[in-house]
Amino acid sequence: AKPAAENLSLVVHGPGDLRLENYPIPEPGPNEVLLKMHSVGICGSDVHYWQGRIGDFVVKKPMVLGHEASGTVVKVGSLVRHLQPGDRVAIQPGAPRQTDEFCKIGRYNLSPTIFFCATPPDDGNLCRFYKHNANFCYKLPDNVTFEEGALIEPLSVGIHACRRAGVTLGNKVLVCGAGPIGLVNLLAAKAMGAAQVVVTDLSASRLSKAKEVGADFILEISNESPEEIAKKVEGLLGSKPEVTIECTGVETSIQAGIYATHSGGTLVLVGLGSEMTSVPLVHAATREVDIKGVFRYCNTWPMAISMLASKSVNVKPLVTHRFPLEKALEAFETSKKGLGLKVMIKCDPSDQNP
């Protein structure tokens, strides 16, 4: 292996304690590949772990951050056949450690022992060199950039949520929240056939971005009641949406989602807030509004790559800021302040292109 000085990594040590450190370059196992990292997006979860925890997931020992990533294969394990050095790949951060009951039914995201980048105690890939399960690295076509490859991870959240919601041709869809996850749900819904999408948020600037990437209607929330929000959504669409995708985790927004959804429709909870939430459950039950949860995603990378390669979805406008790995701390400050939408960290000093 090369000298350790060459694997600069962004490591969280505890609440508020983020450091750039040199780690050794790892050696790939038989079913792994060593990757030279290229582009890694900062996710809200990375910022939360910088503050120490997300719910039951607590940072107890130093952990490398980053899980929205792409890079180039530099070395392959002895049993790897489908990849070779030089291949550009997108990384699916969740790789099951065993073929358990959830893997057998194709819902490996629910496996309790899954490895997941930058979820304690597993290290992520905000570094120069990183090894990963080769079966969860997907080759990128020449017309898909590294940054698009990194954005497959957030896009997958949208694909999985829309799939759980049953979004189909001609649907009217409400997306609550215009942050990165709200916008990938907007993109996925449109790509999957939604005819009209309304996006709600408190922030006018985020809503203008939603409009830019394809929202049919935007609704700026100030202090309306959940029922009033539902009425406004219905007014914009002409009827209630068959599908609501809730990306904020805010109690009043979940309440509005229940009131807004068409009878017999589906509400999917993507953004998560406090564990106990007060909602008009009877209102949902008596109108047969199905409430579904999502946990990350599964089986989305191949279709996301096809969507990007065929230009049926455009994620490029989501990236608003870029920083080299050496300036990762500054990048995290930018992300934390909510100044940009998606902040991208460039890990390859010899190639800082998108």
Curated annotation (Swiss-Prot):
Cellular compartments annotated: Mitochondrion membrane; Cell projection, Cilium, Flagellum
Quaternary context: Homotetramer.
Needed co-factor(s): Zn(2+)
Similarity comment: family membership: Belongs to the zinc-containing alcohol dehydrogenase family.
Residues at which substrate binds: 49, 153, 296-297
Alphabetical list of Pfam families matching this protein: ADH_N, ADH_zinc_N
Binding positions for NAD(+) per the UniProt entry: 181, 201, 206, 270-272, 294-296
InterPro entries with a match to the protein in the record: ADH-like_C (IPR013149), ADH-like_N (IPR013154), ADH_Zn_CS (IPR002328), GroES-like_sf (IPR011032), NAD(P)-bd_dom_sf (IPR036291), PKS_ER (IPR020843), SDH-like (IPR045306)
Organism superkingdom: Eukaryota
Alphabetic keyword roster: Cell projection, Cilium, Flagellum, Membrane, Metal-binding, Mitochondrion, NAD, Oxidoreductase, Phosphoprotein, Zinc
Source organism of the structure: Ovis aries
Location (main, coarse): mitochondrion
Gene Ontology biological-process annotations: flagellated sperm motility; fructose biosynthetic process; sorbitol catabolic process
A molecular function (GO) term: NAD binding
UniProt catalytic activity: xylitol + NAD(+) = D-xylulose + NADH + H(+); L-iditol + NAD(+) = keto-L-sorbose + NADH + H(+); keto-D-fructose + NADH + H(+) = D-sorbitol + NAD(+)
Record field: transmembrane: none
Record Gene3D superfamilies: Medium-chain alcohol dehydrogenases, catalytic domain, NAD(P)-binding Rossmann-like Domain
Free-text function comment from the UniProt entry: Polyol dehydrogenase that catalyzes the reversible NAD(+)-dependent oxidation of various sugar alcohols. Is mostly active with xylitol, L-iditol and D-sorbitol (D-glucitol) as substrates, leading to the C2-oxidized products D-xylulose, L-sorbose and D-fructose, respectively. Is a key enzyme in the polyol pathway that interconverts glucose and fructose via sorbitol, which constitutes an important alternate route for glucose metabolism. May play a role in sperm motility by using sorbitol as an alternative energy source for sperm motility.
Encoding gene per record: SORD
Family annotation (SUPFAM superfamilies): GroES-like, NAD(P)-binding Rossmann-fold domains
Gene Ontology CC: mitochondrial membrane; motile cilium; protein-containing complex
Enzyme Commission code: 1.1.1.-, 1.1.1.14, 1.1.1.9
Note accompanying the cofactor annotation: Binds 1 zinc ion per subunit.
Residues the entry annotates as binding Zn(2+): 43, 67-68
Residues that bear Phosphoserine: 208, 222
Tissue-specific expression: Expressed in liver.
Protein name per UniProt: Sorbitol dehydrogenase
Membrane topology: Peripheral membrane protein
